[in-house]
């Protein structure tokens, strides 16, 4: 399992820790990944994803998983998130069935 957010694409970064004497040591900066279950209102089911804490805040800010995925770019999403986005867009595009009169 890669250390990459499924919604934002944020991954491990490599850099230096710099001491007071300016000595540099190589370091890996890991994303704050959380295993979460998010509710899709359009599909009416729950989805398990591995996302960063930043992505969770972004999902809440945009108004839920469905709104986040509709606005998200395909490049940033993981394969499972892309499939989920396509399902949501297909469900939204379906015409509402008229009520029986």
Swiss-Prot record:
Sections of the chain in a coiled coil: none
Entry annotated with the keyword Ribosomal protein: yes
Keywords: Ribonucleoprotein, Ribosomal protein
Gene Ontology MF annotations: structural constituent of ribosome
InterPro entries (alphabetical): Ribosomal_bL28 (IPR026569), Ribosomal_bL28/bL31-like_sf (IPR034704), Ribosomal_bL28_bact-type (IPR001383), Ribosomal_bL28_sf (IPR037147)
Pfam families cross-referenced by the UniProt entry: Ribosomal_L28
Biological-process GO terms, alphabetical: translation
UniProt superkingdom: Bacteria
Keyword Ribosomal protein among record annotations: yes
Gene Ontology annotations for the cellular component aspect, listed alphabetically: cytosolic large ribosomal subunit
Record-stated family: Belongs to the bacterial ribosomal protein bL28 family.
HAMAP family in UniProt: Ribosomal_bL28
Protein name: Large ribosomal subunit protein bL28
Organism, as annotated: Methylorubrum extorquens (strain PA1) (Methylobacterium extorquens)
Gene from which this protein is expressed: rpmB
């Amino acid at each position: 399992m890669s250390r990459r957010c499924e919604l934002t694409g944020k991954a491990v970064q490599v850099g230096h820790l710099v001491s007071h004497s300016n000595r540099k040591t190589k370091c890996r900066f890991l994303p704050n990944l959380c295993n979460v279950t998010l509710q899709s209102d359009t599909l009416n089911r729950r989805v398990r994803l591995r996302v960063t804490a930043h992505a969770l805040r972004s999902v809440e800010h945009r108004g839920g998983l469905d709104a986040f995925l509709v606005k998200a770019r395909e490049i940033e999403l993981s394969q499972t998130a892309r499939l989920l986005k396509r399902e949501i867009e297909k469900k939204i595009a379906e015409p509402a069935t008229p009520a029986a009169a």
